[in-house]
């Protein structure tokens, strides 16, 4: 995805004045002047220097660089480091000594190296010994806005193993975290995610516990970089564009750390057509579902068993084939660990589950950590 945006409207206004120009664009750009980057592919956090070719400082009255990530500079040859992997359009707005204003552009691809097992085990590797793990539903939303960077950070701080996040696409094809189709309930804005631009969504603030915060809706890349190397990610896609989601996960170097929730065999097939090694995470309701996904996915590591599939024959077949069980425990539930004295956690244990997704991640982690698995 090519970006030339400001993260939110306030930054847009500040960036405009930071370059000290209120000129409007002039005619066609001079054929001889060009923007050059010291590297057009660069790792996140690494510096890249931008220069104007075939022109001297004496030929220029001023220059404003827009790096495409909300940051700007008025230096003649600035250096910049990107913190989020993505593809960025860098724009140099140049006021020539003649008074003409021209725009020159270049593209920079920012990436992160794939996390290997020496940094953090892959999801299949982490499931191999079948120790109990906990997944924070929509992040740790009891202490931060759901589907937010701070909710991810809170889960990490509390030693939670997984987070579940929901991904949707904006009108201009950017991927953001949002469970509902609209932003009405979780931000101070209104409208469908699919009808709003990324910049529009970024101009609103997330709610927490009925109060407006200073936190914005994160992009998928921002969320992944917050999680990178610290917590596993279950991506629940509310869209069918698996390719776009996969590309961002790969660019963030998080393929081994993420699993992609699928509900249909065709969705799993679409993912595997992109990358046969991707961590497919099916939701299973019946034995036919399990059989279908097992025949399609080589070395299926984990499935989510809907409560309809909590049957001995289904579970035993999965477990005997080395498949770990993921189950919901106190998710969108009137019961809590306190009101039912952890009975639903005990049911999860008796069913042989490995990963418990919950709205009470800290409570379940403490409880399960005190149990020894047979």
Where are these regions (language model features)?
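Sec-dependent signal peptide recognition
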Residues: 2-10
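Residue-level marker of positions within ordered structural domains that often coincide
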Residues: 10, 70, 83, 87, ...
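Extracellular/lumenal mature domains of secreted and surface-exposed proteins
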Residues: 19-122, 126-128
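Phosphate-group recognition and catalysis centered on beta-loop-alpha active-site segments
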Residues: 20-29, 107, 111-374
